[in-house]
Swiss-Prot record:
<keyword id="KW-0418">Kinase</keyword>
<feature type="binding site">
    <location>
        <begin position="46"/>
        <end position="54"/>
    </location>
    <ligand>
        <name>ATP</name>
    </ligand>
</feature>
<feature type="active site" description="Proton acceptor">
    <location>
        <position position="168"/>
    </location>
</feature>
<dbReference type="GO" id="GO:0007346">
    <property type="term" value="P:regulation of mitotic cell cycle"/>
</dbReference>
<dbReference type="InterPro" id="IPR017348">
    <property type="entry name" value="PIM1/2/3"/>
</dbReference>
<keyword id="KW-0067">ATP-binding</keyword>
<keyword id="KW-0656">Proto-oncogene</keyword>
<keyword id="KW-0808">Transferase</keyword>
<feature type="domain" description="Protein kinase">
    <location>
        <begin position="40"/>
        <end position="291"/>
    </location>
</feature>
<comment type="similarity">
    <text>Belongs to the protein kinase superfamily. CAMK Ser/Thr protein kinase family. PIM subfamily.</text>
</comment>
<keyword id="KW-0597">Phosphoprotein</keyword>
<keyword id="KW-0963">Cytoplasm</keyword>
<dbReference type="GO" id="GO:0043066">
    <property type="term" value="P:negative regulation of apoptotic process"/>
</dbReference>
<dbReference type="GO" id="GO:0106310">
    <property type="term" value="F:protein serine kinase activity"/>
</dbReference>
<feature type="binding site">
    <location>
        <position position="69"/>
    </location>
    <ligand>
        <name>ATP</name>
    </ligand>
</feature>
<dbReference type="GO" id="GO:0004674">
    <property type="term" value="F:protein serine/threonine kinase activity"/>
</dbReference>
<comment type="function">
    <text>Proto-oncogene with serine/threonine kinase activity that can prevent apoptosis and promote cell survival and protein translation.</text>
</comment>
Length: 323
């Protein structure tokens, strides 16, 4: 994760050349709400990269911690419509995912600037992303990995039910609550509306992308997600991702570097099947023998007995996909 040293939001208000953007976006948005500066106290930079810059802020009225993502309009590649206004698709996707579900980051508000959008989200504390969590603790034992992985599956299923596909499932986009082991899926900047037809665009993380994208630049959303879940599970139990180079991805060169259970190894191999149609559906992963074992997540401060998943509720039927 790239870090930056910006100390304020001053650069957010600077105008830039907007001639390449749709005319509708240039029109002022008339909304009946307080200006951003009167609602939120600006804090420090949390992270910065191609996605934009994320600030650690707080709400003035009650001191609630928030994260504010600054996205320059010139960097937005996918647009959507919200109440008749063109906005980054990321905002539309976050709006589509109801806030009642705890496993996905909650959108609180958004603002439009002449040259950028500000996306205001909840900022849970104390947390660290799963990448840092694994870096600090090393490979996870299978009970912990199972509990975490199940929560990721729940988040993905919830997104599917809302018509959203994340398209960038990875350890850096999962926040771990260090008090109770709860996970939250973040960063929908690479996401899309869920569809059954082929996608021909991808802005996620290369080493988590499926071989059909690397080879043919086309993929189906559900089967590509299952591939990334396989990479994630491998990362959890081995402490590192299985592939670094494109050749390793398209040849599915898996190296099991230490002893893990046969069931876990089999699930990883299934998710990382070369042919998309050979991969399991999300519900088949839930029903896999390795997933059905009793699990106990060990967090930094306490042991959390994860809730039992009702596999019969909120299920999404997925047909086999092939290119």
């Amino acid at each position: 994760m790239l870090l930056s040293k910006f100390g304020s939001l001053a650069h957010i208000c600077n105008p830039s050349n907007m001639e390449h953007l749709p005319v509708k976006i240039l029109q002022p948005v008339k909304v009946d709400k307080e200006p951003f500066e009167k609602v939120y106290q600006v804090g420090s930079v949390v992270a910065s990269g191609g996605f934009g810059t994320v600030y650690s802020d707080s709400r003035i009225a009650d001191g609630q911690p928030v994260a504010v993502k600054h996205v320059a309009k010139e960097r937005v590649t996918e647009w959507g419509t919200l109440n008749g206004v063109m906005v980054p698709l990321e905002i539309v996707l976050l709006k589509k995912v109801p806030t009642a579900f705890r496993g996905v980051i909650n959108l609180l508000d958004w603002y439009e600037r002449p040259d950028a959008f500000l996306i205001v989200m909840e900022r849970p504390e104390p947390v660290k992303d799963l990448f840092d969590y694994i870096t600090e603790k090393g490979p996870l034992d299978e009970d912990t990995a199972r509990g975490f992985f199940r929560q990721v599956l729940e988040a993905v299923r919830h997104c599917y039910n809302c018509g959203v596909v994340h398209r960038d499932i990875k350890d850096e986009n999962l926040l771990v609550d260090t008090r109770n082991g709860e996970l939250k899926l973040i960063d929908f900047g690479s996401g899309a509306l869920l569809k059954d037809t082929v996608y021909t665009d991808f802005d996620g993380t290369r080493v988590y992308s499926p071989p059909e994208w690397v080879r043919y630049h086309r993929y189906h959303g559900r089967s590509a997600t299952v591939w990334s879940l396989g990479v994630l599970l491998y990362d959890m139990v081995y402490g590192d991702i299985p592939f670094e180079q494109d050749e390793e991805i398209v040849r599915v060169r898996l190296c099991f570097r230490r002893r893990i259970s046969t069931e876990c190894q089999q699930l990883i191999k299934w998710c990382l099947s070369l042919r998309p149609s050979d991969r399991p559906t999300l519900e088949q992963i839930f029903d896999h023998p390795w997933m059905c074992k009793c699990d106990l997540v060990k967090s930094e401060d306490c042991d959390l007995r994860l809730r039992t998943i009702d596999n019969d509720s909120s299920s999404t039927s997925s047909s086999n996909e092939s290119l």
